[in-house]
Structures are given as C-alpha cells and as structure tokens.
Amino acid sequence: MDQAKLARMQASVRIGNPPSGPRANRNRGKGTPRRKVKKVHKSSGADDKKLQATLKKMNVQPIPAVEEVNMFKEDGNVIHFGNPRVHASVPSNTFALYGNGEEKELTELVPGILNQLGPDSLASLRKLAESYQNMQKNQAGAEGKKDDEEDDIPDLVEGQDFESKVE
C-alpha cells in the first residue's frame, strides 16, 4: 500500500481527546467520527467468576474439613495444598481445589502421610520410593564417574622428540 495514502487514512481517524497545538483544526470535518480508545482491563477475578458460574451450573457442593491435598507426579515430586477449599460434583465426577499449591519432594511429606494411605496407595508409594532411590543412585553414579575422569592421569605415549629440534 502507498505510504502517503496510508498516512492520509491514519490522519483522517480521530481517536481520544481532541488535539491541541498547531494541528488542532485539522481533521475537524463531520465525516470523521471520534473513536474511543479501547482500554482492556483483564483481571483474574473475572476468570474466577466465570469458573464459579460454570461450577454452579454443574451443581458442585463444598466439602468441609479437608486439611491437605497431595498430588503425586511421575518425577517423584508432590504438589501439596495446605487447607484448600474443595468443591465436588459426584454425578459429573468433577473436583475443584482452591488454594496455593507448593511443589515438594516426597521425602519431605513421607512421615506425615503414611497413616493416610490405603493399601493401593502404599504399593504405589513403594514403587515410587524404589524409582526415587534408583534415580538417586544413578545421579550419584554419574557424579562419581565424572570425578574419576577428572582424577585420571593421561597415559604417556611415545611421540615426537622435541629436544632434537631445539639444537
């Protein structure tokens, strides 16, 4: 598009407050309506309200007295929610957790959560602990190999004789 034509089109559109200064009387014709400046205010509160409205349509009910929620990840870490607000809709199999989640290591939570686990969870926790120990061993073995490589003294190899070149 031609730059001059583009500049004329931009000048013909008035946005916001009327201009002041030497170009104040320019573009004052009736054919150029004033356009409002679009101000977008997006807040997380609006998202929460939409979520609450959707959950209300699903007929969720609050579940009281939930002290903590732990979500186990595949890498061995745990997402821990302390005193979350929990809402549930059993017919639609939907649960909503509200609160600040913290990512913690499994070893930080083990003593406190053992009495809360059932037999299925204990078996999965054992597998998770074994895989965690294997990861620890693999990391320690890799670090040990690096240390061994650094400490090795290179072997002497018969090569060129530089003393004869100095003379």
From Swiss-Prot:
Subcellular location: Cytoplasm; Nucleus
One of the GO BP terms on file: protein transport
Keyword annotations: Cytoplasm, Nucleus, Protein transport, Repressor, Transcription, Transcription regulation, Transport
GO cellular-component term (any): nucleus
Compositionally biased residues, Basic residues: 25-42
Entry-linked InterPro entries: BTF3, NAC_A/B_dom_sf, Nas_poly-pep-assoc_cplx_dom
Region (Disordered): 1-48, 133-167
Signal sequence extent: none
Complex and partners: Part of the nascent polypeptide-associated complex (NAC), consisting of egd2 and egd1. NAC associates with ribosomes via egd1.
UniProt-recorded name of the protein: Nascent polypeptide-associated complex subunit beta
Organism ancestry: Eukaryota, Fungi, Dikarya, Ascomycota, Pezizomycotina
